[in-house]
Amino acid sequence: MDITRREFAAALTGVAGAATLRRDALRFPAADPCHLPAPIQALTPKTGGIAPITDEERRARIAKAQGLMAAGGIGAIVIEPGSTMHYYSAVDWHPSERTFAMVIPATGAPVWVCPAFEEARARELIRIGDDIRVWQEDESPFARIAGILKDQGAASAKVGLEEEVRFFVMDGLRQAAPSADLVSATPVTAGCRMIKSAAELALMQRATDITILAFKAAFATLRAGMNQYEFGNNMTAALTRLGGSAPWALVGFGKYSAFPHGSVQPQRLERGDIVLLDSGCAVEGY
């Protein structure tokens, strides 16, 4: 039987729509607070009185990193967007194909490398270090990093790469700064991050306290017949109402509780089932 392009496209649309309905039918509309169970609706924020990490503490972290760099003979470290960049600067930036980087030299303030069309946004976010070197679409960001190394007298020194630096960035820098000895920055970054300050511990404790309260509220919503998405959404809604950010939850019922990271199979809670709930949140990034 012959079929036209229009008929073929319509058939594909129908299949996709059926798949979407099957998947979405298992999801609970947690975004609508009117549908949240009473134990979740009763929750209120528990983030009052928290003290965010100050710029002074971040500068102290940079100073400590520079001390570790001196001890290890490292002339600079290069950091891409991620938790380490946030740790030293509070800058959150989505990593993309356009290189955005923080360079911490052995002495002095950090220097930044940024796509030219993102400069205005970068200046809104960057509070530590005002030297931002931009690159146009027809220019190399790695040449900008190499220029920073040259200005810092580190063109032929050990240059540490933070563990989240991607291969194409490392490879581009290797070509732009062939005399640099590219090494791991982990002795520096882990040397700072693995020892938590009192302020960090307080934020981690608050995130833990919020998570425990959310567990109690979410478990109070368990009922026979609910699916894993409904329970997971109750948990993330509880974390959000308590003031947690970046909430997440992995859920498994019955035999699927043996899957440490959950299963995509539809699940309905039955009396006597084991319930797996792996969940958490952050407070001020911790």
Q: What residue spans do the PLM features occupy?
A:
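Short catalytic-site patches enriched in acidic/histidine residues
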Residues: 85-96, 186-191, 195-198, 226-286
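Generic secondary-structure signature for well-ordered alpha-helical cores
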Residues: 74, 150, 178, 206-216, ...
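A short, terminal or domain-edge coil/loop segment
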Residues: 128-141, 168-170, 212-218, 235-246, ...
